């Protein structure tokens, strides 16, 4: 996810928070990754009551390895940054589905995931 405490990221995180039990029942855990610091993540977790871990990838190594760092458009301008992407990974560590940036509906993202895994 791109950034702690922004409207889209907050909506997405809260959707996942609210559906954590349903996702766990299907065998899925939730991890968030952004380039924000661990301190920023902790504040975000506390402010939103998040019930899952956030990884601080401040040098973007993991984001780049996942293909979730690259060129995007923001406010009509091209920039380099985090590409909002979700990977569904099974118990064997195999990616079974990828939600590309334009496919993610932040407010309803947990429902999108549940529809795929049901």
Report the location of each language-model feature.
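Chalcogenol-based redox active-site neighborhoods
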Residues: 1-118
């Amino acid at each position: 996810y791109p950034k702690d405490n922004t409207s889209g990221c907050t909506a997405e995180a809260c959707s996942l928070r609210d559906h954590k039990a349903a996702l766990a029942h299907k065998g899925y855990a939730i991890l968030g990754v952004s380039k924000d610091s661990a301190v920023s993540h902790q504040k975000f977790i506390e402010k939103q009551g998040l019930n899952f871990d956030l990884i601080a990838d401040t040098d973007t190594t993991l984001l780049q390895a996942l293909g979730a760092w690259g060129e995007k458009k923001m406010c009509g301008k091209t920039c380099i940054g985090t590409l909002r992407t979700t990977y569904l990974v099974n118990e064997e560590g195999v990616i079974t589905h990828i939600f590309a940036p334009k496919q993610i509906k932040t407010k309803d993202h947990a429902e999108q995931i549940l529809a795929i895994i049901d």
